[in-house]
């Protein structure tokens, strides 16, 4: 009878009351229980008052109660009915799973989007490559055309230049004929001298006659000598005329670091140069400004105009045929 009464009394007591009574029998405080179970004092107080904290899951609360029961030597089997009431197990909320067809449809859409992106990228790259190739091909064709034109002009200049030696030869032949015919008047003097040898007076006459011929020969020689001496003096004048364009403020100086085709035209439309220049070549041109230049390889030439370098970097970066006009800058008054 006493055992049944004790069992009924234990069932009447709640889980929190039984744990508090057992703690008090062992002489433990709530602080001591909280330190041993590594819990907050407020959590121990809520368990003894049969409160379920809102921020604590029921699974953790059941675990704390079981640890508390083992600490105060209360059988867990006796607390199970009270645990079901105080901390009932709650069904976990599970998010509804997306169907496989939805994920497959989204994956298919992403695949189409990726394929379209790659297609656009390939089209852009292809158009860029085609544009570059067309420009490069057009430049090469233009350079080839200009080179062919310059070759034809050089051949025409060579054909027309063959008649020049004939003219100079005619001039030299005309210049030499007077020198060759000049001694001819001396022959009658010699013949007359040969016929008049028997008479002494003739000998005197011979002497008197020969002397003027010799004088004429001497004067011809002396007159020819200044002419011969004057011809070298004319050379510095011609050389000065050749060197004069270098001192011209409108002179155009070009140095070549590689083979390059170019064409230079002055303000009158005269072509100062049109053709191919080889590596390490120099070119000095003088004409009427402004100059119009067409250069096949801008990176292979360095240009100076009026003592200042000409900037060709914009043509070198784009790798294009350079077409530019050089205007004359006014020189400061002396």
UniProtKB/Swiss-Prot annotation:
<comment type="function">
    <text>Cytoskeletal protein that is involved in cell-shape control through regulation of the length of the long axis.</text>
</comment>
<keyword id="KW-1003">Cell membrane</keyword>
<dbReference type="InterPro" id="IPR025194">
    <property type="entry name" value="RodZ-like_C"/>
</dbReference>
<feature type="compositionally biased region" description="Low complexity">
    <location>
        <begin position="176"/>
        <end position="211"/>
    </location>
</feature>
<keyword id="KW-0472">Membrane</keyword>
<dbReference type="InterPro" id="IPR010982">
    <property type="entry name" value="Lambda_DNA-bd_dom_sf"/>
</dbReference>
<dbReference type="InterPro" id="IPR050400">
    <property type="entry name" value="Bact_Cytoskel_RodZ"/>
</dbReference>
<feature type="topological domain" description="Periplasmic">
    <location>
        <begin position="133"/>
        <end position="334"/>
    </location>
</feature>
<feature type="compositionally biased region" description="Polar residues">
    <location>
        <begin position="161"/>
        <end position="175"/>
    </location>
</feature>
<dbReference type="Pfam" id="PF13413">
    <property type="entry name" value="HTH_25"/>
</dbReference>
<keyword id="KW-0133">Cell shape</keyword>
<dbReference type="GO" id="GO:0008360">
    <property type="term" value="P:regulation of cell shape"/>
</dbReference>
<keyword id="KW-0735">Signal-anchor</keyword>
<keyword id="KW-0812">Transmembrane</keyword>
<feature type="topological domain" description="Cytoplasmic">
    <location>
        <begin position="1"/>
        <end position="111"/>
    </location>
</feature>
<feature type="DNA-binding region" description="H-T-H motif">
    <location>
        <begin position="30"/>
        <end position="49"/>
    </location>
</feature>
<keyword id="KW-1133">Transmembrane helix</keyword>
<feature type="transmembrane region" description="Helical; Signal-anchor for type II membrane protein">
    <location>
        <begin position="112"/>
        <end position="132"/>
    </location>
</feature>
<dbReference type="InterPro" id="IPR023690">
    <property type="entry name" value="RodZ"/>
</dbReference>
<protein>
    <recommendedName>
        <fullName>Cytoskeleton protein RodZ</fullName>
    </recommendedName>
</protein>
<feature type="domain" description="HTH cro/C1-type">
    <location>
        <begin position="19"/>
        <end position="71"/>
    </location>
</feature>
<keyword id="KW-0997">Cell inner membrane</keyword>
<feature type="region of interest" description="Disordered">
    <location>
        <begin position="155"/>
        <end position="241"/>
    </location>
</feature>
<dbReference type="GO" id="GO:0003677">
    <property type="term" value="F:DNA binding"/>
</dbReference>
<keyword id="KW-0238">DNA-binding</keyword>
<dbReference type="GO" id="GO:0005886">
    <property type="term" value="C:plasma membrane"/>
</dbReference>
<dbReference type="Pfam" id="PF13464">
    <property type="entry name" value="RodZ_C"/>
</dbReference>
<comment type="similarity">
    <text>Belongs to the RodZ family.</text>
</comment>
<dbReference type="InterPro" id="IPR001387">
    <property type="entry name" value="Cro/C1-type_HTH"/>
</dbReference>
<feature type="compositionally biased region" description="Low complexity">
    <location>
        <begin position="219"/>
        <end position="241"/>
    </location>
</feature>
């Amino acid at each position: 009878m006493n055992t049944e009464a004790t069992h009924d009394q234990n069932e009447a007591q709640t889980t929190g009351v039984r744990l508090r009574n057992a703690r008090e029998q062992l002489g433990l405080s709530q602080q001591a229980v909280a330190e041993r179970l590594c819990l907050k004092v407020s959590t121990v107080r809520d368990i003894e008052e049969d409160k379920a904290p809102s921020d604590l899951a029921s699974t953790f609360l059941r675990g704390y109660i079981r640890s508390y029961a083992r600490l105060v030597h209360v059988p867990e089997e006796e607390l199970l009915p009270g645990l079901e009431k105080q901390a009932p197990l709650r069904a976990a909320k599970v998010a509804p799973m997306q169907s496989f067809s939805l994920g497959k449809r989204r994956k298919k859409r992403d695949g189409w989007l990726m394929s379209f992106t790659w297609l656009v990228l390939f089209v852009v790259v292809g158009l860029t490559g085609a544009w570059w190739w067309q420009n490069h091909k057009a430049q090469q064709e233009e350079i080839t055309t200009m080179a062919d034109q310059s070759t034809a002009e050089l051949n025409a200049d060579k054909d027309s230049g063959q008649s020049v030696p004939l003219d100079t030869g005619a001039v030299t032949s005309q210049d030499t004929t007077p020198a060759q015919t000049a001694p001819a008047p001396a022959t009658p003097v010699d013949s007359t001298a040969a016929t008049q040898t028997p008479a002494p007076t003739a000998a005197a006459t011979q002497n008197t006659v020969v002397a003027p011929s010799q004088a004429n020969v001497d004067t011809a020689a002396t007159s020819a000598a200044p002419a011969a001496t004057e011809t070298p003096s004319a050379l510095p004048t011609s050389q000065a005329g050749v060197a004069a364009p270098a001192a011209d403020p409108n002179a155009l100086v070009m140095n070549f670091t590689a083979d390059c085709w170019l064409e230079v035209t002055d303000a009158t439309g005269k072509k100062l140069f049109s053709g191919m220049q080889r590596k390490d070549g120099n070119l000095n041109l003088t004409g009427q400004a402004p100059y119009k230049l067409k250069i096949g390889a801008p990176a292979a030439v360095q240009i100076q105009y009026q003592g200042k370098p000409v900037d060709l970097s914009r043509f070198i970066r784009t790798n294009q045929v350079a077409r530019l006009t050089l205007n004359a800058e006014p020189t400061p008054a002396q």
